[in-house]
C-alpha cells in the first residue's frame, strides 16, 4: 500500500484560469475505464517540457519535441494503457493522426497539439478506440476537472497525484496546480512519469525552458523507484498568463518566487511517486552533503537509492547497513576518502572513520528501520554541496505487480 499517501481532495486542486480538462473512456486496456484526457489551453499560453533521456523514446515524445519547437500549443491529449513505444513509423503516424483529430475539435493546427501515452510498450496504439472517444472528452472540458484527470492518467498507480499552491506576484494572486502519474519504471532522467504543472502567471517565452529544467532538477529528477528509465517520460510546464501580473522577463525576485511555488508542487508530486512505488511499504529520503559539487552528491544518493540490496533490507526492517557503505563505494565518485565519511540512519550514527561508529547500537538502528519513513544521511566532508533523492523499498508485491502487469 502507498506510504502515507492519499488522493488529493478534489476541492484542493485549484482551477488555473486558461486551462480546461476533459476525460473520457476509450477502453484501451479495460472496458469502461476513463483513460483518455484532453487539456485545453487558452490562446497565448506558453508551454515548455523536458522528456525522457531513453534513446528508445516513444513516438509521442518525438512528436511533442517537434511540435514544441513551433510554439503556440493549444491542447494536450493523454492516453493510458498503451505507451506507443517501440512502434516505429506506424507509431509516429498514429500519434500524428491523434493530434490531427484533436486539432479538428479545437479548430487549431495539428502542430498545436501535444500527445502523451503511457502503458504497455511494443503494442500498436489502438487509434480505432482513441479517435471515437475524443469528442466525449472534448464535451467534458471543465476548469475543475484536475482530480478526474489525475485519476485518468494512472497506470499501476494506486493513488491519484495532484497538488496546488498560490502566491502573490506583482499584487496578483498566482495559482499553480499540477498532476502526475508514476509508480514503477521510475528513475531519472526522468522516470515512467507524466507530469503536468500549470500556472496562470505571465512569464516570458525565453524563460520557460529554463524554468521547466530548474523545477525538474529538484523534483522529478530526484526520485527513483527501481532504476529503470522509461521510454515516455514527460514533464510539461504551462503558463497561461491570465493572472494579470507584469510579465516575468528576467531571473529576478519574481522568477525565484514562482520557481519556488512550482518546485513545491513538483516535489510533492515526485515524492508521491516514491510513496506509491509499486508494492512500497517504506518511503526513504537519501540526503548526501559535504560534496565537492551537487553531481557527486546525487551520484552517491542514487547508488544507495537504487540498490536492490539496500531496498530489500529496508523492506525487511533489517539494519544490514553495510549495504549502504557498499553502494557508496561503487557509486564511482573519484578520490573519495572513505575514512572521512559519516553515515546516519535517522539520528543513529552508523559509520565513521572507515568503519562502524564507536557508539553504534544495532537495536537503535533496528528501531529506526521499523518506521514507514526513513532518512539516510551521508556526509562526504569534502565540500559544501548537497543533494537529496527519494525512493522506496522493494517488497514481494513489486515482483508480483510487474510479473502480472500484462496478464
Swiss-Prot record:
Substrate binds at residues 155, 181, 192, 278, 402, 407. One of its GO terms (cellular component) is cytoplasm. The record marks 118-119 as: Involved in the stabilization of negative charge on the oxyanion by the formation of the oxyanion hole. The record marks 191-192 as: Cleavage. Its EC number is 2.3.1.35, 2.3.1.1. The keyword Protein biosynthesis does not apply. It catalyses: N(2)-acetyl-L-ornithine + L-glutamate = N-acetyl-L-glutamate + L-ornithine; L-glutamate + acetyl-CoA = N-acetyl-L-glutamate + CoA + H(+). Keywords: Acyltransferase, Amino-acid biosynthesis, Arginine biosynthesis, Autocatalytic cleavage, Cytoplasm, Multifunctional enzyme, Transferase. It is an enzyme of class 2 (transferase). GO terms for molecular function: glutamate N-acetyltransferase activity; L-glutamate N-acetyltransferase activity. Pathway: Amino-acid biosynthesis; L-arginine biosynthesis; L-ornithine and N-acetyl-L-glutamate from L-glutamate and N(2)-acetyl-L-ornithine (cyclic): step 1/1; Amino-acid biosynthesis; L-arginine biosynthesis; N(2)-acetyl-L-ornithine from L-glutamate: step 1/4. It comes from the Bacteria. The active site is at 192 (nucleophile). GO terms for biological process: L-arginine biosynthetic process; ornithine biosynthetic process. It is found in: Cytoplasm. The keyword Transferase applies. Catalyzes two activities which are involved in the cyclic version of arginine biosynthesis: the synthesis of N-acetylglutamate from glutamate and acetyl-CoA as the acetyl donor, and of ornithine by transacetylation between N(2)-acetylornithine and glutamate. Heterotetramer of two alpha and two beta chains. Belongs to the ArgJ family. This is Arginine biosynthesis bifunctional protein ArgJ. It comes from Thiobacillus denitrificans (strain ATCC 25259 / T1).
Amino acid at each position: 500500500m502507498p506510504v502515507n499517501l492519499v488522493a488529493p481532495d478534489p476541492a484542493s486542486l485549484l482551477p488555473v484560469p486558461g486551462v480546461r480538462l476533459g476525460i473520457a473512456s476509450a477502453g484501451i486496456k479495460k472496458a469502461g475505464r476513463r483513460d483518455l484526457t484532453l487539456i485545453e489551453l487558452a490562446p497565448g499560453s506558453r508551454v515548455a517540457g523536458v522528456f525522457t533521456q531513453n534513446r528508445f523514446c516513444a513516438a509521442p515524445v518525438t512528436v511533442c519535441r517537434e511540435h514544441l519547437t513551433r510554439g503556440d500549443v493549444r491542447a494536450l491529449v493523454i492516453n493510458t494503457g498503451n505507451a506507443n513505444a517501440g512502434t516505429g513509423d506506424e507509431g509516429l503516424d498514429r500519434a500524428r493522426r491523434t493530434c490531427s483529430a484533436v486539432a479538428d475539435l479545437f479548430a487549431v493546427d495539428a502542430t498545436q497539439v501535444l500527445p502523451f501515452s503511457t502503458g504497455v510498450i511494443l503494442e500498436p496504439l489502438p487509434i480505432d478506440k482513441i479517435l471515437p472517444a475524443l469528442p466525449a472528452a472534448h464535451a467534458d472540458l471543465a476548469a475543475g476537472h484536475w482530480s478526474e484527470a489525475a485519476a485518468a492518467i494512472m497506470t499501476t498507480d494506486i493513488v491519484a497525484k495532484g497538488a496546488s499552491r498560490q502566491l502573490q506576484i506583482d499584487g496578483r494572486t498566482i495559482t499553480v496546480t499540477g498532476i502526475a502519474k508514476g509508480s514503477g519504471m521510475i528513475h531519472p532522467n526522468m522516470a515512467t512519469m507524466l507530469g503536468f504543472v500549470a500556472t496562470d502567471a505571465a512569464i516570458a517565452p525565453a524563460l520557460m525552458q529554463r524554468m521547466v529544467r530548474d523545477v525538474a532538477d529538484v523534483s522529478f529528477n530526484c526520485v527513483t523507484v527501481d532504476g529503470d528509465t522509461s521510454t515516455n517520460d514527460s514533464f510539461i510546464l504551462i503558463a497561461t498568463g491570465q493572472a494579470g501580473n507584469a510579465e516575468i522577463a528576467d531571473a529576478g525576485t519574481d522568477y525565484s518566487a514562482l520557481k519556488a511555488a512550482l518546485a513545491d508542487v513538483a516535489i510533492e508530486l515526485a515524492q508521491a511517486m516514491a510513496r506509491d512505488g509499486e508494492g512500497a511499504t517504506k518511503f526513504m529520503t537519501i540526503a548526501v552533503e559535504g560534496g565537492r559539487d551537487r553531481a557527486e552528491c546525487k551520484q552517491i544518493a542514487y547508488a544507495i537509492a537504487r540498490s536492490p540490496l539496500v531496498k530489500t533490507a529496508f523492506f525487511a526492517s533489517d539494519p544490514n547497513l553495510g549495504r549502504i557503505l557498499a553502494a557508496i563505494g561503487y557509486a564511482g565518485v573519484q578520490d573519495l576518502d572513505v575514512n572521512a565519511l559519516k553515515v546516519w540512519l535517522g539520528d543513529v550514527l552508523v559509520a565513521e572513520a572507515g568503519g562502524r561508529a564507536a557508539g553504534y547500537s544495532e537495536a537503535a538502528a533496528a528501531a529506526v528501520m521499523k518506521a514507514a519513513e526513513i532518512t539516510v544521511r551521508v556526509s562526504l566532508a569534502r565540500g559544501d554541496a548537497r543533494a537529496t533523492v527519494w525512493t522506496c523499498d522493494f517488497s514481494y508485491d513489486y515482483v508480483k505487480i510487474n510479473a502480472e502487469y500484462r496478464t
